[in-house]
Each structure stands twice: as structure tokens, then as C-alpha cells.
Amino acid sequence: ERPIKNRYAVLGVHSTSQLKYWNHPDGIKVMQDAPNWNVLCDMLRKAGITPVVTEKDELYGHPPYYNGIPKKSVKKLGISLMDTINYIEHSEFFIGLSSGLTWLAHGLGQRVAMISNFSEDWYEFDLNDEKYVRIVNHDVCHGCWNRAGVDFPFISKDWFWCPIHKDTPRHFECHTSITPQFVFDSIKKWI
């Protein structure tokens, strides 16, 4: 049964490493406010789409920085897996990071827009699948995940792992370079 009568999209805003997050140009200190996601939520609402977040946690990350849920979304936090599946199945589409919820949405046959610039285009899903949009910026550093173990070691205990630009102004530029407008333009065909 459809959980919301209006048209809506499910957003997957959390992941398992800061490298996978949609980081903001102002740095990780602002991430608990989910600035990029809030701007995208405004754009979706103006287009008649209600943004819904079905994450387990309101905040997720590593001290002293945590990533938050967009305040401008409908929050369905900590719901059961079956309820999460129901929300995703009946949504217009899913927008997320490289994360379990994105894989779940893809497995359910839902249209998926994945914000993922740390891995190469071919890595997660079939680029020929019309239900899949890969949101990337090839004009900046990207794809380090697919070179880990070859060109440099992956350090799993380092939440802020960025093998090329860590602790420089370019730290996480793979995702800070992706704007809410770029994401919105990438999914316009589904609205």
C-alpha cells in the first residue's frame, strides 16, 4: 500500500565512510545540517515531489563530525526494513549515495540516481539501464576507490580517507563539486 498519497522520492543520505557522502564545499563541519540535501529538497518540493528520508539514524559519522538528515524532508527514521521497502517501491524514484539503501532500491527495480564520484562510472550499476542515473563530475579528482590497493592503500579505520587530497583544500572534491542543481538536472526526466 502506498504510504504517501502525494508524489514523493526517497533520499538515502547516509553511508559508511565520509568519502561516500555528498560533502559540502564549506567542509564537513556543516554536514550535520545536510546543506546540499536541503537545497535539493526545496527543488523537489517546487517540482511537486515530497522528499522522504528512511534512514535508521538522524546523525551518522565519526567524532567530531556527523552527517545529518535534511530538515526539509519528511523523516521516517528507524522504520522497519519492510516499511523502508514499501516507501522505496511506491516512490517516483530514489536518490542516494553508494550505500545499502541505494542497492536495495536498485534491487527493487526502482529508478535510482546515485551520487557517487569516488568510484568509476562502471563500478556500481549498469550504465545502460534507463532506470539508473550516475551523478558524477569528471572535471575533478574521482575514481580513487577503484585504484585503492593498486596505487595506494585503503585505510579502513580512517573515516576521512581521501588518498590523494586529504587535509588539503581539495579534500573530498569528488563530491563537493557536485551541486544540488546538477543533481536536480540529472533527475528532471523522472519528474
Predicted feature locations:
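Mid-sequence helix-capping/hinge segment at a functional interface
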Residues: E1-M31
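Nucleotide-sugar donor-binding patch of glycosyltransferase catalytic domains
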Residues: H106-I191
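Short amphipathic alpha-helical segments
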Residues: R7, K72, T168-H171
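Donor-binding and catalytic core of enzymes assembling or modifying cell-surface/extracellular glycoconjugates
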Residues: D26-Y123
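Charged/polar, solvent-exposed surface patches and flexible loops
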Residues: L11, N86, D185, K189
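Short regulatory "switch" loops immediately downstream of catalytic or recognition motifs
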Residues: G12-W22, V53-P64, W145-C162
